[in-house]
Amino acid sequence: MDKYISKTPLSCYFEELVDTFISVVNSINKVDESKHHEVELILFKPPIITLTNLYNMATTTESYIEFTMLPVDKPNTKFRNRIPLSKIHGLDVKNNQLVESLDGFIWEEKSLLLKKDISDNSSAIIKYSIEEKTLFVDYKRRNASIKLELVSVVRAKLRNIVIDFKMKYFLGSGAQSANSSSLLCALNHPKNKPSLYIEFEIMMQDKNISKKKLLEELNMSASALFLSHPKYIRLCPSINPILRTHLLKKQDIININTDDLYITSKTDGIFSHVYIEKKSIFCYFSHLGYIKEYTASREIEETIYLYAEMRKEESILYLTVIKVLKPCMEDRLSELAFVKNHLTGIHDRLVFVTKCYDGPFESSSDLVVSIEEMLKTEQEGIILFYSKGEDSTTDYKVKKDNTIDQCVNVIYRYMSSEPIVFNDKGSFLEYKRYSNDKGFPKEFSTGKLDLNGSVEYINNIYCIEIKHLNPCTGITNLVLPIKFIAEFSHNDELIQPRIDKTMKYLYESGYYGNQLSVIMDHLNDQKLRIGDVFEEEKLADIAAHMKLKDSMRLNPDGNYFLSNRVRGALGILSNFVKTLLISLYCSKTYLDNHSKRKVLAIDFGNGADLEKYFYGEIALMVATDPDDNAIETGKKRYNERNAGDKSKYYKFNYIKETIRSETYVSSIRQVLYFEKFSLVDWQFAIHYSFHPKHYSTIMTNLQELTESGCKVLITTMDGDYLDTLKEKKKFIIRKLLPETENYLSIEKIDDDKVLVYNPSSMSKPMAEYIVRRDTLIRVFREYKFKLIDSCNFKTIIDRNISFINGVSRLESRGSTKNFFELNRKALEECNDTDVLELLSHYMVYVFSKEV
């Protein structure tokens, strides 16, 4: 923090702005009414509280689509135009349609004449520009060079200055016509975040105005925005918490080391950094996002740096000291005496206090009893800390309500410009909640905000206003964009917006609240009470809930496949068959309603087929697998493919579950609720589950999760062929590999199982159940699934050889051309191998659920 307090205060920015304005005015000999001279200070990534304060004093609020083109022959110049949102009906409007809706050829030409960086703040600049009208006749022909943005503006026009708070959503280029390039997509997806700016512009209406009057007006308005005179404000980036506080799971309490361990109450305040030097007290309050300076009543001899928690009561700020960072102390208990001796009475509005604590404890039992007693009287929970040693740098918390932070995105619909929903009880907003899945937003659930006295939707700037906030923060109401971070209770109640976390979400990449794994830990911990930690049955219930119930797994848990395996002809041609199968049954031949394309992928593995379903244009996929590593790889693949703005993949959830489990349906219902699937993908995996002891569970799960007409895609080995094996059978599949690696072996080990091993891709053999055709058909028929398609892989390859070797050579699209080239090489590699024979023993089965 000390490196930021040495920076110039905000008042110096205004002095530099006024000096620039006076210099510009003196350089203008004659005023041309057709030109607008603009001198402005722009603050990037402003504190979000300034939006609220400016809205309270605003004279204008509006939104519009801004079109910007940078002419190649005119450096430092841009052409601009705009369409008010009031002239656009509905939000499902593509970029090229917006360009077509522009009227006339008169645009605004803005030329940048001066750009001055603030010396010690890269997020602040001063600009001098000239704006004038210009003709831009062929803009429709050059729409690919036009950038589109949705701009929402909150404006306060004073006597000599104009203050704008702008929120800009990037829409893409004017030539784009994809669904991902539309107003609807920009508003509905949390990855499309607005860029925020605050601009202070001095108007040219009075060239003879004095520097003193301009500074008075700027400082007065800034005092209202920043809640203090600008000379006491220092802008800075977000300062991270010094001390991390981790959730202590209740089942872990009995195992924690009690040496030098103490407990104290947890309060709901604002984390703050306090730096005291001589008579200056610098406070960084995390919800404000900048540093405020106060003057101490006496001079402090040594520099003091504190990490504290602020609560406001009436006009007094109570700062509960959590950690003294300067001077360095070995024992945190000695910090309490230091605060009392050095910081008492140093300011009439800043009161430094410490907490009472309990400890140390002789045993875990004493600790549990103390925690249980303290929780009876505490509103929030308790904090555990070590007074000294390496562990003293981390605090632990046990909360009454394990709250979580998640990203909220209000839901907009196609034909409506507003998200408000009406019912017999009033009006409300629907929103989606997103958790942070390793830097990507993962949809968690939905909710609604009742539009009552506490919440209002501000329709013309795509914001909401939340009132009656916790008074201890010093903020009673808050205006936020329709994308923000909120705190939720364990029972899904939206408690309050998180101002500091919202700024982190808006201004940093890859943050959407708590990680999904953290959220699940919090929710599972909520199911235990403190007193349950000594009851083995209660702990076992929680452990059983968290651990996959799959005691009858065919192969023991472990890694069976090599990480550096290279796919040969067998894998490539099998992939060709799967591609055709998925393309066919995702196509409109079978599913002509886009809303029905919901896929359940059973034992989905590492997600190799994700892209096939993207081109199948499905709406969503829920995948399940019992293996953590497979799920990790599958999620990573999905996130990589869904990373770009142009690549809007279908909604994807990956759950650790097995179709053999009685909890399978309830696990799926956590992400899909009451909808049913229209397509089930069970490729090269049914042979790990299809056994008489699992028939009832498997088929009941399938029946409950699928709608009428649902297609179940199954690929597996021909069980009737496997039944005939008398000894181990080897198929040569890679002639270029040594004899120890070039084969795939199948050995029947009993009446219902075979052992499969491919040394070039597997570290050890895997057992598979024998899936006999008649048995498969009979079991599926008992649960109202009818076989509609069946064929072996070789037949499909034979039917397509002429096309692969012939017409497909005319393909010019890069990925398609490479796909067929790969299959042509695979067919060539089949010579002198048993690949085609082996493919004749691989089967496709397609079942359809009867009405």
UniProtKB/Swiss-Prot annotation:
Cofactor entry: Mg(2+)
UniProt similarity note: In the N-terminal section; belongs to the dsDNA virus mRNA guanylyltransferase family. In the C-terminal section; belongs to the class I-like SAM-binding methyltransferase superfamily. mRNA cap 0 methyltransferase family.
Protein name: mRNA-capping enzyme catalytic subunit
Binding residue positions for Mg(2+): 38, 40, 199, 201
Site note mRNA cap binding, residues: 612, 637, 687, 768, 842
Subunit structure: Heterodimer of a catalytic and a regulatory subunit. Intrinsic methyltransferase activity of the catalytic subunit is weak and needs to be stimulated 30- to 50-fold by the regulatory subunit, which is itself catalytically inert.
Domain of life where this protein originates: Viruses
Active site: 266 (n6-gmp-lysine intermediate)
Gene3D superfamilies: 2.40.50.830, 3.20.100.20, 3.30.470.140, Vaccinia Virus protein VP39 (3.40.50.150)
PROSITE patterns listed in its UniProt record: RNA_CAP0_MT
Site (Essential for RNA triphosphatase activity): 80, 110, 131, 164, 166
Subcellular location(s) per record: Virion
Region described as Triphosphatase-guanylyltransferase: 1-544
Keywords linked to the UniProt accession: Hydrolase, Magnesium, Metal-binding, Methyltransferase, mRNA capping, mRNA processing, Multifunctional enzyme, Nucleotidyltransferase, RNA-binding, S-adenosyl-L-methionine, Transferase, Virion
